UniProtKB/Swiss-Prot annotation:
GO biological process: protoporphyrinogen IX biosynthetic process
Listed name of the protein: Uroporphyrinogen decarboxylase
Source organism of the structure: Streptomyces griseus subsp. griseus (strain JCM 4626 / CBS 651.72 / NBRC 13350 / KCC S-0626 / ISP 5235)
Enzyme class: lyase
MF (Gene Ontology): uroporphyrinogen decarboxylase activity
Predominant location: cytoplasm
E.C. numbers: 4.1.1.37
Amino acid sequence: MSANDSPSGQQTTTSASLDAVRHATHDSAFLRACRREPVPHTPVWFMRQAGRSLPEYLKVREGIAMLDSCMMPELVAEITLQPVRRHKVDAAIYFSDIVVPLKAIGIDLDIKPGVGPVIAEPIRTRADLARLRDLTPEDVPYVTEAIGMLTAELGATPLIGFAGAPFTLASYLVEGGPSRNHERTKAMMYGDPQLWADLVDRLAEITGAFLKVQIEAGASAVQLFDSWVGALAPADYRRAVLPASAKVFDAVAPYGVPRIHFGVGTGELLGLMGEAGADVVGVDWRVPLNEAARRVGPGKALQGNLDPAVLFAPTPAVEEKTREVLDAAAGLEGHIFNLGHGVMPNMDPDALTRLVGYVHEQTAR
């Protein structure tokens, strides 16, 4: 393998620069926790830490549509760095949206404020699958450029790449947008299981390719978000979802970076989500971490899981609930502190800053 080659055979960031990133971040508390190694303190980061809770985010995003902002490397880098500067979190997460790879391959979609992703022409027939072409690095040059900027700025702080999981992307594509009950999604899954299997398999290939671009540009870990999969029963997850999610994790396995799997309302699915191949399983606030560890089984670190709404309570109450999370995590093989879902837009950013400091202080070894 030449200096510029990657496991996928694509020409990308030089191996020397990637080696420098890996060396700088290797002993970070976040990556050590992902590997279930001893840590100087429990690492902390937050889903949606870069976003509307920060006044500096609102300022730089003013007048710029969400999808447009995801394709502006300097803006992406600035937004990604903002919570690292403000909160002193232990990891940055790349600022983007889960539908970016779909937009990049030509799917006609938009993110409508107050609604979410809206698909102009939903995917509902076998003929529609032809619109889901391969994703290449050339489709997302802004990702490679932004991550190059970020790794230069972040130094020893790891950058997490991310993507939407096949089920959640499929739900958006089939429904045409967000859905409370996922009627059309489930109708395809149950009524035409082969079409469904082909759809999520195709999305697994696209998602895997998107994560590879991020890793090859310098991401030190990746997280697969399955926002809607909590709508499924375990048997349906095993049959109709797990193979596609596993395909994504298998695609990035050769890179050796930690792989995180997170879904909302997935307490009954935690063991299956671990089976899909993640090194770290994210847990929402509904299941205590010690019980989550029992469900997931050995050999996995856990991430979570403070209820985001707790941050609206007075500081003593936040600290009490935080101690409950830390106590439940006391016997885990590896623990990354996070919220059980994303940061809410109207959350006081100072509460997040205090939370990071409190977790670091309480868990200092």
